[in-house]
Amino acid sequence: MPLTMSQAFIGNFLGNSPKWYKIAILSFLIINPILFFYVSPFVAGWVLVLEFIFTLAMALKCYPLQPGGLLAIEAVAIGMTSANQVLHEIEANLEVLLLLVFMVAGIYFMKQLLLFAFTKIITKVRSKILVSLMFCLTSAFLSAFLDALTVIAVIIAVAVGFYAIYHKVASGKDFSAVHDHTSESNNQLNNSELESFRGFLRNLLMHAGVGTALGGVCTMVGEPQNLIIAAQANWQFGEFVIRMSPVTVPVLIAGILTCLLVEKFRIFGYGAKLPDAVHKILCDYAAHEDAHRTNKDKMKLVIQVLVGVWLIAGLALHLASVGLVGLSVIILTTAFNGITDEHALGKAFEEALPFTALLAVFFAVVAVIIDQHLFAPVIQWALSYEGNTQLVIFYIANGLLSMVSDNVFVGTVYINEVKAALIDGQITRDQFDLLAVAINTGTNLPSVATPNGQAAFLFLLTSALAPLIRLSYGRMVWMALPYTIVLSVVGVLAIETGFLEQATQYFYDSHMIIHHSAKDVIAPLTSH
């Protein structure tokens, strides 16, 4: 029986999403104008924000760009905000968009070097605790300079490679044979060995994922929202690192200790060992690759190392805007490694562009929040407190929202509201700087709780690797739990005890940072 037009419409709308989800989005699109025109723009605005958070929380049912984008288009169409205000938000955050477009693409051309490094870690180090620590710390270091999505993408590529090699050899084939490593019907595989290997890979990926959060919070380029916060506060790379350090350094130490403890006591699904047979296969493969590496291949790795040095130096010394440094990475690696085909270049941009488009939709929702003054009551309540209590409230408020929503969205909303409070004279510039630290750390650290909060976790969960190693949503939340508790508590204690305030005062006295004026925040506003 042929489909009716209405059935065909529902079938096409949002593709393979569940029917209930499609009906929910259509209902939102019908309800919002009614609320806006006949109830209250303020109520309609809050409903839109909750609907948008819902699309982020349901990211596994449907990528949020389409449902979130429809809601944003309707919001502009009915007058909740204007297209000019959306453009203004995008202009103000152009650096973030450039970071996502160029930096992620740039690192795509450095994958060989990163794959080489992680392969050596797994094959040369036999201690599981040491391997876990190295993955966590390496991810943290890389994420301080690179986008967390990029770092996770590299580690996923490493894990898929290892899984494919083991599956191929255990199935009785040699390294060069063509083989489907996703097949579950192979009887030659040792099931207990395979399960142990899956557990081992799950452990490493979770340690690496948390590592990206530990490192990402430390610098202004570690996460997209850091760049937004740094731009609003008018901080450079070095100042951002120094201002965050009273919270980020204790949290980093606590994160490393958590990594050691969960591995040592084999709790929360950690402690899986790499079977000897699997280790031998991986070592044989690494030796095979080393033996067949030509001078041309070696030269490519040398070029990638040199470009990596430029990348870190360029960011640390703020020699150019982050996106432009990323563009230079693309040009240098492709020029000197001979990647000149247009299609080969295009693949590098596939990873980041959907998220870049989604970020533009975030800014449309931020424009609604600004025009309808949605967060004003919450911010006023938080600002009614003083000193450390105010900082703690902002940290917790950011943390709770970041657990269920995307942290770029949360960070952008809160820093905009605090900036408005500074411009209105409700807070001093020094308090604004402390609040920016609380917002940045509150947005980044508790968000490891669920894949909804960390884009890198969501990327991992939706990857082709997750079903192969049996990594489900629930398992990710369970394995992230010890980190969530430790990072959140240590972060809040660093603020609540007054350590952040005291350390910041010491930095002022030592002339490591300077007192800024409120004009530094207002100036970027008037320049658009």
UniProtKB/Swiss-Prot annotation:
Query: What's the encoding gene here?
Result: nhaB
Q: What is this protein called?
A: Na(+)/H(+) antiporter NhaB
Could you tell me the superkingdom of the organism this chain comes from? Answer: Bacteria
Key words, A-Z: Antiport, Cell inner membrane, Cell membrane, Ion transport, Membrane, Sodium, Sodium transport, Transmembrane, Transmembrane helix, Transport
List the record's Gene Ontology CC terms alphabetically: plasma membrane
Q: What does this protein do?
A: Na(+)/H(+) antiporter that extrudes sodium in exchange for external protons.
Q: Where is this protein found? A: Cell inner membrane
Question: What does the record give under GO molecular function?
Answer: sodium:proton antiporter activity
Q: Which reaction does it catalyse?
A: 2 Na(+)(in) + 3 H(+)(out) = 2 Na(+)(out) + 3 H(+)(in)
Q: Is this entry keyworded Aminoacyl-tRNA synthetase?
A: no
UniProt source species: Shewanella putrefaciens (strain CN-32 / ATCC BAA-453)
Q: Where are the transmembrane segments?
A: 10-30, 63-83, 96-116, 131-165, 204-224, 240-260, 305-325, 359-379, 391-411, 449-469, 476-496
What is the membrane topology noted in the UniProt record heading this document? Multi-pass membrane protein
Family to which this protein belongs:
Belongs to the NhaB Na(+)/H(+) (TC 2.A.34) antiporter family.
Checking Pfam families in the record gives: NhaB
Q: Which residues form a coiled coil?
A: none
Annotated InterPro entries: Na+/H+_antiporter_NhaB
